[in-house]
Amino acid sequence: VYFNLIASDVKHSFWIPSAGGKMDTNTENINKFWLNFDSKRAEKAGEYFYGKCAELCGPSHALMDFKVKTKSREEFDQWIEEMKNAKAVADSDLAKQGEKLFQEKSCIGCHAVTPADKRPEEARTAPNLANFGERTRVAGILPHNEENIRNWLKDPEQYKPGNKMTKTYPELNDEELDALTEYLSGLKVETK
């Protein structure tokens, strides 16, 4: 797998220990490298390879973990096609309210909700949420459930100090939290 790495804020270091290799990410240029996720390593790693930031990058450095799930070449190609064609769809009335709030509160200014993010690179300042409803973690650290989604939206600073979401939107009331939680939970690509 080839990686093109660039940071949006400070220097980080992209590292997947069991796959080998790590690479710094800088704000001023793209660093490129590749890792081989062969079947033996994938079997040994289990369902996921675990990665983290290996550069002391700020107050939430210790919380910068991520997972890599391996797929066969055929499964990966199919996944890419699904990602290209996926569209965010709010199914329930509450989810539709959440979708509207996502626009009104300017969440969409930082977060994409479709896999094929066509915004300019400079606008991609926050994680793409296209498959948020399929993730196992909220903000990469909290178990993925409605209560934790609500808690994160209500006070992200409590869980990840120094994150970019804190104080970027007005305080949300309970109805808004319910609607946004419903909308975000419905953002799925693989399990629709």
Predicted regions and their residues:
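Extracellular/periplasmic metallocenter environments
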Residues: T27-K84, E104-I108
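Electrostatic cytochrome c docking/interface patches
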Residues: E74-Q103, T191-K192
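Histidine- and aromatic-enriched segments that form or immediately flank copper-ligand environments
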Residues: D9-E28, F66
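Axial heme c-ligation environment in periplasmic c-type cytochrome domains
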Residues: H61-M64, A123-F132, W152-L187
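Gly/Gly-Pro-rich "capping" loops immediately C-terminal to redox-active cysteine motifs
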Residues: N26, M64-E75, A112-R150
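Detector for the c-type heme attachment site
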Residues: A54-G58, C110-D117, E134, K154-P156, ...
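Sequence/structural segment immediately N-terminal to covalent heme-attachment motifs in c-type
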Residues: A90-P115, A126-L129
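Short Fe-S-cluster ligation motifs
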Residues: M83-Q97, I141-D155, Y159
